[in-house]
Regions:
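C-terminal transmembrane module of eukaryotic multi-pass membrane proteins
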Residues: 397, 401-409, 439, 444-470
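Beta-rich catalytic cores
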Residues: 94, 114, 128, 195, ...
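Beta-propeller domains
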Residues: 4-5, 29-99, 104-188, 216-246, ...
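Per-blade loop-tip surfaces of WD-repeat and WD-like beta-propellers in eukaryotic adaptors/scaffolds
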Residues: 138-141, 177-179, 215-250, 257, ...
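Residue-level detector of Asp-centered blade-edge/turn motifs that repeat once per structural unit
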Residues: 102-105, 111-114, 203-205, 267-269, ...
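Repeat-based blade/solenoid architectures
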Residues: 32, 88-101, 190-196, 297, ...
């Protein structure tokens, strides 16, 4: 059985708006081509009441991280109307990596509340304190666009500033029918010696997971017993976690000379696994081709024997495991370390890459031999790109996380339409002045997490993204992201 411990998430109390105001703002978000998250400025002074009558009516201005500065006494305020759903939680120690587990609850789930499963590995202060966590997160509510603040399990940090006490709630949020909208989190923990640099679940058999430890060991685990226990457990409105259980891995590979991060299961061939480290070796056949450490690997979604790798040497290499031990193609992708890559599952000719200088690029693999395959390049982020992933539901949409504490969502099909914007601005009393240098493909900006490490789209819940950072996890569903599956037959 899963033992239960109290680790309750408390939703943040929000200022309620009238239905007319919400509908007006919703229409504004849907019509605009550029929809970054609105960040409101709030100058808080104790003892002073706010008065809208004394403030002249002015257009809202988009606040740009790394460009605009906050004055003393100012802070950014989350706009909950920008989300269909937003929740946050902390598991004690930070998690560098996680993966969303496929389930049997349905392929196209759009109705709240949602239930999801995931696996994550910790980065604890001492090696014996680390573990792999199997998560069942249920009652993930939405539509009210409720925000859940960070929950601190260890330490003396307060959940909220004392100035925000009037916005907190000590009781569960309830929907109109009286049901709780607080997510319920249950965790089964497996002891893992050392920090987990990267963890991935096999797409065909999600109970089979592989972890890469900072010790250099790659271990394959069968987590079926723990997932079955979570699936059969009754939440009854309670969060819960188990003590770290001893569980022997199926395989313990120690062939790498040092630690690494690059690891990937094949989506086409069950059980086929790639791993690469600073010494660039792949189990079980060593391959050579990069002049520096390999940072990420991705199997092709369309060809069972082809994969891509990226490296600190600034290159991306394409490999065919049937042909020799050197890359079939290699090209210069960035002028800095290439940290992450993502292969588009809906348009397999497109590969995205993110670099250490904050830039990310889109490469068309059909034209590599003809010259520069780069079809798009963005320098919006100010710090290294830490994660990048194409949407499983929209071929032109991808999400990016960076060390600048931003998670951004991009739609490459968008173009700036000045005539449409001018017409919209003339018809709308409340509008946002868009910075001229803001890329028209930037669809959404999510902030509020510190030192973002990794993000993933949920393949079975369109529009849902989960991200991990130094201060915990966020589950978000932006309001302007399509929440239906594409018509693949079209």
């Amino acid at each position: 059985m899963t033992s239960l411990l109290a680790a309750e998430l408390k939703p943040q109390q929000l200022i309620h708006k009238s239905r007319e105001e919400e509908e007006s703002q919703a229409k504004a978000k849907m019509v605009r081509s550029i929809n970054p998250k609105k960040a409101k400025r709030k100058n808080k002074k104790k003892g002073e009441a706010s008065s809208s009558a004394s403030v002249p009516s002015m257009p809202t201005r988009v606040w740009q991280p790394g460009v605009d500065k906050l004055e003393e006494g100012e802070e950014l305020q989350c706009d909950p109307s920008a989300y269909n759903s937003l929740h946050g939680f902390h598991v004690g120690w930070p998690c560098l990596s996680f993966d969303i587990l496929g389930d049997k609850l349905g392929l196209n789930r759009t109705e709240f509340p949602h239930t999801l499963y995931m696996v994550a590995g910790t980065q604890a202060e001492k090696a014996p304190l680390n573990s792999i966590g199997l998560f069942k997160i249920s009652n993930v509510s939405g539509k009210r666009r409720d925000v859940v603040p960070k929950t601190v399990v260890n330490g003396d940090d307060a959940m909220e500033d004392e100035d925000d006490e009037d916005e907190d709630s000590d009781s569960d949020e309830e929907s109109e029918d009286g049901a709780s909208t607080t997510p319920i989190i249950q965790v089964r923990r497996v002891a893992h010696h050392g920090c987990v640099n990267r963890i991935r679940a096999m797409p065909q058999n999600p109970h089979i997971c592989v972890s890469w430890a900072d010790s250099g060991h790659v271990q394959v685990w069968d987590m079926s017993s723990h997932l079955n226990a979570l699936a059969e457990s009754e939440t009854e409105g309670k969060d819960g976690t188990s003590p770290a259980l001893n569980h022997a891995p199926l395989v313990n590979f120690s062939g790498h000379k040092d630690e690494g991060y690059a690891i990937d299961w094949s989506p086409a061939t069950a059980g086929r696994l790639l791993s690469a480290s600073g010494s660039w070796t792949v189990d079980p056949i060593p391959l050579t081709g990069h002049t520096a450490s390999v940072e990420d690997l991705q199997w092709s979604p369309a060809e069972a024997n082809v994969f891509a790798s990226c490296s600190v040497d600034g290159t991306i290499a394409l490999w065919d495991v049937r042909v020799g031990k050197t890359p079939a193609l290699s090209f210069k992708a960035h002028n800095a370390d290439v940290n992450v890559i993502s292969w588009n599952r809906l348009a397999s000719c497109m590969l995205a890459s993110g670099s250490d200088d904050g830039a990310f690029s889109i490469h068309d693999l059909r034209v590599i031999k003809e010259g520069d395959a780069k079809v798009a390049h963005f320098e919006y982020h100010k710090h290294p790109i830490t994660s990048i992933e194409w949407s499983a539901h929209e071929s032109s949409t991808l999400a990016v996380s960076s060390g600048d504490n931003q998670l951004t969502i991009w739609d490459l099909s968008l173009e700036k339409d000045e005539e449409e914007e001018a017409e919209f601005k003339a018809q709308t009393k409340e509008y946002v002045n868009t910075p001229q240098d803001l890329p028209p493909q930037l669809l959404f900006v999510h902030q509020g997490q510190k030192d973002l490490k990794e993000l993933h789209w949920h393949n079975q819940i369109p529009g849902m993204i989960i991200s991990t950072a130094e201060d915990g996890f966020n589950i978000l569903m932006p309001y302007n992201i399509q929440n239906t599956l594409p018509d693949l037959a079209a």
